[in-house]
């Protein structure tokens, strides 16, 4: 290695410098040999600071870059980048490569000129001297090329300092870097010249604000994001990215002169990658030519590797690996593509620093376009030998790490399956979650059907090899036409196919971390469909994650048709890190009945797919994987539900040897999935057709029936001090209590010195601006970014969705796009809401007509006209609907009305009092964007959940304090009016009532789509409660005047009470004691009642001194029943087992719903539109939370981090009941649903 300190070359004048460049190589590059720079040369100077980006430098000439030839402006940054477009303000570049924009990076690092000692200069220069100087540098690097530039961009970083960060050391102080980048362009090509003078690089790493650690600089080029509908990284090239290679920049060269590096960056030859110069650094004075031995010495000395693909007649240079037989990498997630085979030329040869010097980065020449085209990905061993000593964390917690001669490998322990990096319990059901987006042309249509952010959920019964996949919110225009594409979910079946002896399914091979690209050709139909799927392993919830993209054209299948696919087999061909398969299959389309006949047609389509993954090649002793395996799909079921817009695929899969026909009936049942083991058990094959069933880890039983082991109950102290144990199916989870965090030893320690950081609160996150995205705090120091409704992206970069491009409005309406929203307005001469427009003037509503009739104004009511004394005039809202509360201004009486203006019985109140009326008309949503209804998962801890029209928001609690700055939306369904809320602490699911549809729905706190469980035979469902022990829900219906019960999935409904009720609203349960409580705010006879949960022993608890009792809550710890009254403006409590009531607080404004937690009551108030905390012990309001959007608040409940202790007679085995098990004090009652037709149901006590 040359020593820079040993350079003793004399200084030369500029003229002699040019002569030396032409005659032969020089020594180390002196600063005087840089291109002239500074204000005297006409340079612009970048503003001093950190992370500064220059204004656009408009170019006179055009710059070529990769396959682009239209770049007319560039941007210069403090951090050693020349950008082809303006860098996003939210993107942090140092320590990450490639960035999202086109970039030339002579020294990408976190650089700082805040102190004013360093400077960044830049200009475009057309002077003959500079143009000739650039031409000579290029000529040195590419002697076979005749290049005469017409424009030169010169950028100089002079004496720039590193951003030190909090970990800066005194040894780094005073160190400065000077380097230069020159972009020379002609009409046909562009070149980059990087110049690193002697002693110009004094530091090689900088502090990363993102990773909070020292990271090496990067030298490279990036095309940036490419693609129209779906963005992905384009081609990029890295030439240095560790300390040793960065140090070599001033000592080495690819253009024959130390410190000089030349690259061809824009020409027909660079469409797939930047081309490095290939001129040896001459180490001898006589300038003699060298043989290959010397070439090997020099390139090895410089840290360069020839990665060009040799032709059969051209062997790789000695000392370098054949690119078609490269070692495999162990570090996950980094890929390099095979270069296209063909005869190499000097123009296509690429150089890169040796792979073993880059343990944390991608191999250097990456061609994403070729990955997408061929799907072939090879893994490179990018690091020196790695051992388990410092890489154990790369293995699953259920795996062991083993060292081998060339590296380490992970292997799952007994009773677990996977590839070692990812392991799951054998026989345990698996869940797969992900997103799907598509751009699909149906039939001959020229307009694509576009959908984004669509949920995919899959459930896998592993020991039977059955996979059930559902894709939600698929438009009907494309839903039926996607029915033949069962392999969208079939890849999940391959992952968990039943394994025959000696054969491996996809998860055993890949661990659920791979990329799949498939191409579907429909014979006899033009066009094709491309399917891309990325599996990203197991997330923190134990679920596999997948992203799916669909693009292309499919044949049209008639609405209402069904598709039948016969069982089939598919051969999978295996080689290192690559799996391929192709097949030709049939599917039959059966059209809907027409005149008693159902026409059917059989079609043929071809599938070709490539799966790329990373494997561990260090374990030579492991059994070799068969080169070909056969996937047998024994049953295929496909369905499109147009009402729910859900696409479903179900397949049964096994993997084994190549054979003809269906699986042998004499095979072991474990291999073909015909055993009778529990879904939480593993099937163990024995001799012949014998087998045994063994419950999976975390379950107990005989294998035929397995029960979850409650590890938390069996060993309550297993999580240690300051921790809470949460039981989960098959496992458990320990969570540190507030104020503690896990130490390296897995115990909870006080977080005094390492408090978690809420980056959302501090603003130190990388989410897009608040106008486009929200930062969602997930607990600890973690957060996630989510684009706001009306924007799309990953949350870090969100772009406005132009809804008007998708023809959202009626053809006779104007569409106005706005950031995050859009508006539809009927054209003149048409009436409607913009989504439906009809000729004519806008018709008046019933309320408007009645109001005008009473006022005697046929042409419209005069707002200034006085109302006749004693006359009732209805009040209409801004949309023409009846205001839910109507009042007679002469008498002072008020009452509730339905949507048709009819008075609701029992709602009339005397002067000075207004009844708590609910609007059954959902607010219009056409003024905003289509809001996705996906649930935003809740972080750990206890939360208040409250409803605000169609939105449910969460408000974290720390002990009894509301953490108001962390309030976020949990769920938003714009078309609904959510009234009541209840929380199931067992499954972590929130239930609600909706009076606009009307319906009852639910959603999991872990995320996913909300579902409706009841939508039939409802009037105005309001209050809702549940029995988390007996697994039932209860609700009140103020229109049908009844109280009902059902199972938690909405089945087995039974009416408990339908008499003696006028306006039932609040309802709560005491599952441990078997009691039910509810309010009835009938103005003539308001009351609070109770009964056993089976409907027996009904009685009145409170009747006197009540006004409008709304909300109701029961505290299981203190056995107190509390309520809020909007008529008396009080909060009161009582113990149902004891006489007497206690006034907690008077002077409440207009309380609606209430819940309790610890010593506090929390209630929603209609007048202040707020959530108020009230201390029961001192009878005082302690805090108030005002949501960002000031609209009416409805139900409120508490989402507990764990269930309260207790049980009832329905807790175990449904109390021995065949259907509804309803607890009573000290017992239970078995009840049948109201509709028992054809149901074998037994009622008993």
From Swiss-Prot:
Cellular compartment(s): Secreted, Extracellular space, Extracellular matrix, Basement membrane
Residue ranges annotated for the NIDO domain, each copy included: 106-268
Gene3D superfamilies reported in the protein's UniProt record: Green fluorescent protein, Laminin, Thyroglobulin type-1, TolB, C-terminal domain
Signal peptide, first to last residue: 1-28
LDL-receptor class B repeats: 988-1030, 1031-1073, 1074-1118, 1119-1160
SMART domains attached to this UniProt entry: EGF, EGF_CA, G2F, LY, NIDO, TY
Sequence segments annotated as region (Disordered): 307-344
Disulfide topology: 388-401, 395-410, 409-616, 412-423, 670-683, 677-693, 695-706, 712-725, 719-734, 736-748, 760-775, 767-785, 787-798, 804-815, 809-824, 826-837, 847-876, 887-894, 896-917, 1210-1221, 1217-1230, 1232-1241
Motif (Cell attachment site): 700-702
Residue numbers marked as site, Involved in perlecan binding: 457, 459, 648
Domain Thyroglobulin type-1 intervals: 844-917
GO cellular component: basement membrane; cell periphery; collagen-containing extracellular matrix; extracellular matrix; extracellular region; protein complex involved in cell-matrix adhesion
Modified sites of kind Sulfotyrosine: 290, 295
Residue intervals of the Nidogen G2 beta-barrel domain: 428-665
GO molecular function: calcium ion binding; collagen binding; extracellular matrix binding; laminin-1 binding; proteoglycan binding
Predominant subcellular localization, coarse grouping: secreted
Biological process terms in GO annotation: cell-matrix adhesion; extracellular matrix organization; glomerular basement membrane development; positive regulation of cell adhesion; positive regulation of cell-substrate adhesion; positive regulation of integrin-mediated signaling pathway; positive regulation of muscle cell differentiation; regulation of basement membrane organization
Keywords associated with the record: Basement membrane, Calcium, Cell adhesion, Disulfide bond, EGF-like domain, Extracellular matrix, Glycoprotein, Repeat, Secreted, Signal, Sulfation
Record PTM: N- and O-glycosylated.
Domain EGF-like: 384-424, 666-707, 708-749, 756-799, 800-838, 1206-1242
CDD domains: EGF_CA (cd00054), nidG2 (cd00255), TY (cd00191)
Function: Sulfated glycoprotein widely distributed in basement membranes and tightly associated with laminin. Also binds to collagen IV and perlecan. It probably has a role in cell-extracellular matrix interactions.
Subunit structure, as described in the record: Interacts with FBLN1. Interacts with LGALS3BP. Interacts with PLXDC1. Interacts with SVEP1.
Official protein name in the record: Nidogen-1
Species of the source: Mus musculus
């Amino acid at each position: 290695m040359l020593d820079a300190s040993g350079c003793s070359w004399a200084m030369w004048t500029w003229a002699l410098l040019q002569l030396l460049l032409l005659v032969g190589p020089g020594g180390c590059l002196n600063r005087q040999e840089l291109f002239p720079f500074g204000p005297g040369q006409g340079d612009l100077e970048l503003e001093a600071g950190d992370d500064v980006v220059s204004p656009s430098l408009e170019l006179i000439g055009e710059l070529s870059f990769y396959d682009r030839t239209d770049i007319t402006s560039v941007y210069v940054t403090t951090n050693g980048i020349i950008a082809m477009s303006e860098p996003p303000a939210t993107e942090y570049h140092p320590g990450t490569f490639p960035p999202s924009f086109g970039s030339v990076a002579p020294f990408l690092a976190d650089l700082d000129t805040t102190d004013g000692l360093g400077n960044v200069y830049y200009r475009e220069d057309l002077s003959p001297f500079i143009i000739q100087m650039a031409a000579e540098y290029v000529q040195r690097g590419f002697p076979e090329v005749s290049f005469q530039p017409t424009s030169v961009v010169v950028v100089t970083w002079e004496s720039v300092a590193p951003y030190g960060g909090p970990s800066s050391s005194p040894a780094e102080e005073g160190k400065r870097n000077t380097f230069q980048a020159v972009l020379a362009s002609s009409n046909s090509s562009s070149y980059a010249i990087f110049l690193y003078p002697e002693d110009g690089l004094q530091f090689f790493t900088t502090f990363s604000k993102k990773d909070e650690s020292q990271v090496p600089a990067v030298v490279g080029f990036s095309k940036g994001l490419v693609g129209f509908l779906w963005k992905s990284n384009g081609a990029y090239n890295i030439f240095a990215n560790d300390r040793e290679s960065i140090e070599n920049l001033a000592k080495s060269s690819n253009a024959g002169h130390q410190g000089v590096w030349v690259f061809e960056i824009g020409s027909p030859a660079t469409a797939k990658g930047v081309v490095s110069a290939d001129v040896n650094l001459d180490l001898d004075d006589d300038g003699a030519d060298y043989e290959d031995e010397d070439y090997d010495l020099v390139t090895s000395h410089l840290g360069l590797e020839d990665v060009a693909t040799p032709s059969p007649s051209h062997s790789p240079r000695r000392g370098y690996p054949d690119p078609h037989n490269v070692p495999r990498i162990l570090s996950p997630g980094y890929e390099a593509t095979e270069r296209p085979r063909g005869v190499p030329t000097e123009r296509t040869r690429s150089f890169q620093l040796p792979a073993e010097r880059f343990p944390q980065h991608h191999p250097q020449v990456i061609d994403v376009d070729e990955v997408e085209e061929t799907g072939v990905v090879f893994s490179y061993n990018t690091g020196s030998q790695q051992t388990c000593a410092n890489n154990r964390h790369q293995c699953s917690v259920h795996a062991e790490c083993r060292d081998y001669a060339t590296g380490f490998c992970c292997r799952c322990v007994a009773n677990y399956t996977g590839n070692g990096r990812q392991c799951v319990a054998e026989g345990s059901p698996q869940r797969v979650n992900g997103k799907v987006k598509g751009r699909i042309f149906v039939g001959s249509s020229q307009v694509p059907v576009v959908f984004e952010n669509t949920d995919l959920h899959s459930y896998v019964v592993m020991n039977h090899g059955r996979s059930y996949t559902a894709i939600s919110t698929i438009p009907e225009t494309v839903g039926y036409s996607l029915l033949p594409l069962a392999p969208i979910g079939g890849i999940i079946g391959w992952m968990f196919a039943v394994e025959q002896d000696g054969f491996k399914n996809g998860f055993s091979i890949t661990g659920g971390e791979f990329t799949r690209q498939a191409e579907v050709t429909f014979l006899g139909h033009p066009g094709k469909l491309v399917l891309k799927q990325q599996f990203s392993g197991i997330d923190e919830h134990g679920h596999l994650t997948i992203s799916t993209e669909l693009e292309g054209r499919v044949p049209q299948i008639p609405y209402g048709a069904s598709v039948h696919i016969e069982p089939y087999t598919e051969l999978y061909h295996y080689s290192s890190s690559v799996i391929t398969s192709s097949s030709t299959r049939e599917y039959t389309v059966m059209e809907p009945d027409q005149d008693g006949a159902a026409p059917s047609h059989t079609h043929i389509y071809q599938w070709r797919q490539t799966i790329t993954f990373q494997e561990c090649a260090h374990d030579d002793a492991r059994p070799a994987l068969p080169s070909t395996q056969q996937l047998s799909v024994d049953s295929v079921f496909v369905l499109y539900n147009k009402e729910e817009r859900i696409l479903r695929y179900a397949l049964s899969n096994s993997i084994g040897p190549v054979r003809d026909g269906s699986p042998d009936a004499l095979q072991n049942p474990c291999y073909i999935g015909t055993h009778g083991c529990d879904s939480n058990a593993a099937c163990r094959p024995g001799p012949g057709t014998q087998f045994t069933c063994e419950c999976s880890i975390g379950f107990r039983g005989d294998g035929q029936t397995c029960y979850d082991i409650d590890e938390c109950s069996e060993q309550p102290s297993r999580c240690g001090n300051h921790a809470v144990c949460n039981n989960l199916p098959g496992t458990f989870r320990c969570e540190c209590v507030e104020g503690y965090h896990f130490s390296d030893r897995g115990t909870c320690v006080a977080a005094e010195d390492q408090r978690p950081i809420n980056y959302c609160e501090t603003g130190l996150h990388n989410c897009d601006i608040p106008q486009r995205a929200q930062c969602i705090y997930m607990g600890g120091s973690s957060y996630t970014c989510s684009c706001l409704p009306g924007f799309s992206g990953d949350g870090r970069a969100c772009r406005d969705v132009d809804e008007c491009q998708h023809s959202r409005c009626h053809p006779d309406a104007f569409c106005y796009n706005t950031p995050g929203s859009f508006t539809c307005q009927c054209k003149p001469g048409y009436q409607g809401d913009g989504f439906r427009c009809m000729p004519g003037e806008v018709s008046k509503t019933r309320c408007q007509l009645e109001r005008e009739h009473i006022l005697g104004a046929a042409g419209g009511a005069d707002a200034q006209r006085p109302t006749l004394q004693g006359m009732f005039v209805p009040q209409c809202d801004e949309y023409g609907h009846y205001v839910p509360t109507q009042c007679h201004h002469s008498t002072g009486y008020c009452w509730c009305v339905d949507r048709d203006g009819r008075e609701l019985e029992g709602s009339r109140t005397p002067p000075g009092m207004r009844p708590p009326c609910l609007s059954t008309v959902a607010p219009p949503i056409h003024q905003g964007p289509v809001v996705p209804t996906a649930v935003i998962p809740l972080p750990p801890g206890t939360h208040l959940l409250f409803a605000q029209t169609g939105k449910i928001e969460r408000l974290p609690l720390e002990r009894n304090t509301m953490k108001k700055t962390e309030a976020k939306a949990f769920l938003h369904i714009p078309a609904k009016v959510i009234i009541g809320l209840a929380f199931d602490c067992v499954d972590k699911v929130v239930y609600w009532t909706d009076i606009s549809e009307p319906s009852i729905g639910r959603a999991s706190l872990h995320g996913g789509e909300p579902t409706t469980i009841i939508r039939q035979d409802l009037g105005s469902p309001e209050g809702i409660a549940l029995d988390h022990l007996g697994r039932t829900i209860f609700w009140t219906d103020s229109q049908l005047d009844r109280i009902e019960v059902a199972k938690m999935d909405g089945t087995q409904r039974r009416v408990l009470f339908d008499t003696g009720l006028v306006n039932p609203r609040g309802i709560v349960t005491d599952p441990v004691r078997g009691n039910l409580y509810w309010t009835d705010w009938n103005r003539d006879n308001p009351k609070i009642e109770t009964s056993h949960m089976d409907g027996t022993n009904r009685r009145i608890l409170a009747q006197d001194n009540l006004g409008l009792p709304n909300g109701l809550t029961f505290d299981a710890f203190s056995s107190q029943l509390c309520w809020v009254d909007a008529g008396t403006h009080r909060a009161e409590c009582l113990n149902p087992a004891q006489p007497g009531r206690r006034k907690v607080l008077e002077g409440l404004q207009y309380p609606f719903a209430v819940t309790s937690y610890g010593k506090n009551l929390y209630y929603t108030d209609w007048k202040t539109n707020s959530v108020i905390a009230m201390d029961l012990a001192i009878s005082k309001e302690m805090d108030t939370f005002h949501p960002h959007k000031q609209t009416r608040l409805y139900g409120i409940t508490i989402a507990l981090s764990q269930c309260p202790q207790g049980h009832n007679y329905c807790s175990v085995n449904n109390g021995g009941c065949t259907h509804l098990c309803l607890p009573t004090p000290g017992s239970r009652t078995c009840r049948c649903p109201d509709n028992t037709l054809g149901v074998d149901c037994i009622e008993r006590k």
